[in-house]
Amino acid sequence: MVVINGVKYACETCIRGHRAAQCTHTDGPLQMIRRKGRPSTTCGHCKELRRTKNFNPSGGCMCASARRPAVGSKEDETRCRCDEGEPCKCHTKRKSSRKSKGGSCHRRANDEAAHVNGLGIADLDVLLGLNGRSSDVDMTTTLPSLKPPLQNGEIKADSIDNLDLASLDPLEQSPSISMEPVSINETGSAYTTTNTALNDIDIPFSINELNELYKQVSSHNSHSQ
C-alpha cells in the first residue's frame, strides 16, 4: 500500500485479491483505495453540523456535488451556499414533534361529572339503561317532587284519624260479635252445653221399656238353649 498525500493507493491486482494492505507494487498503475461500505453522500461540512450542533438536513447534501441544480433555476436560488463561504441554510435546528392535545383527561372527567350531576333521577335511569327505552320513562319524576319524611316532632295526635283502618270495619259492622269480656263461668257452661248436645242421642222409648225388652230377649235366649 502506497500513501501519497494522506491518500492510500494500491495496484488493481492487489485490490481485487483483497491484498491492498500488503501491496508494494509501484511499477504499475495505482488506484485509490476506497473505504469499505457504501460511499457517503454527505460532505464533511454537513456531517460536522449534524454531529456537533444537532442539525438535521432538509434533504440530500448538495454541497460540492455533481447533482447541483442548474444556475438560475428556482432550486439554485434556494440552495445552500455554505461551500461558497455563505452561512449554511440547508440545515435547521431539530424541533420536538410533540403535539398539544385538545384537552386533558382531568378536564374531560370534570365535564362528565358535571353533566351527570345536572341530570334528574329519570335521566340517570335512561343513561344507565335501567328502565329500557327513553319513551317508556316518565321524565316528570324528579328528586325535588318527592316529599321529605316526617320528623318525630312533626307527628300530631290528630293524624291518627287519617290512618287507613279498613281492616277493622268488618268487626265494627258485625252485631253478633261482642267486644265485652266473657267470664270463666259462662265459658264453662257453654262448654258443657256443647258437650251434652253432641253426646246425647234421642231414643223413642224410656228406660223402663228398655229393661222390659231386655228381660224378654234374655228369657227367649235361655229357652232356645
Curated annotation (Swiss-Prot):
DNA-binding region per Swiss-Prot/TrEMBL record: 1-40
Annotated region (Binds copper and DNA), positions in chain: 1-108
Gene Ontology process terms (BP): intracellular copper ion homeostasis; intracellular iron ion homeostasis; positive regulation of transcription by RNA polymerase II; regulation of transcription by RNA polymerase II; response to copper ion; stress response to copper ion
Regions that span the bilayer: none
Keywords of the record: Activator, Copper, DNA-binding, Metal-binding, Nucleus, Transcription, Transcription regulation, Zinc
Region (Required for transcriptional activation), start-end ranges: 109-225
Annotated Zn(2+) binding sites: 11, 14, 23, 25
UniProt-listed Pfam families: Copper-fist (PF00649)
Alphabetized InterPro entries for the sequence: Copper_Homeo_Regul (IPR051763), Cu_fist_DNA-bd_dom (IPR001083), Cu_fist_DNA-bd_dom_sf (IPR036395)
Entry GO MF terms: copper ion binding; DNA-binding transcription factor activity, RNA polymerase II-specific; RNA polymerase II cis-regulatory region sequence-specific DNA binding
SUPFAM superfamilies per the UniProt record, alphabetical: Zinc domain conserved in yeast copper-regulated transcription factors
Cellular compartments per GO CC: nucleus
PROSITE patterns named in the record: COPPER_FIST_1 (PS01119), COPPER_FIST_2 (PS50073)
Keyword flag Transcription regulation: yes
Subcellular location: Nucleus
Additional information: Present with 1760 molecules/cell in log phase SD medium.
Functional summary from the UniProt entry: Trans-acting regulatory protein that activates transcription of the CUP1 gene (metallothionein) in response to copper ions. Binds to the CUP1 UAS sequence 5'-GCTTCTTTTCCGCTGA-3'. Binds DNA only in presence of copper or silver. Copper seems to alter the conformation of the protein.
Protein name: Transcriptional activator protein CUP2
Organism this protein belongs to: Saccharomyces cerevisiae (strain ATCC 204508 / S288c)
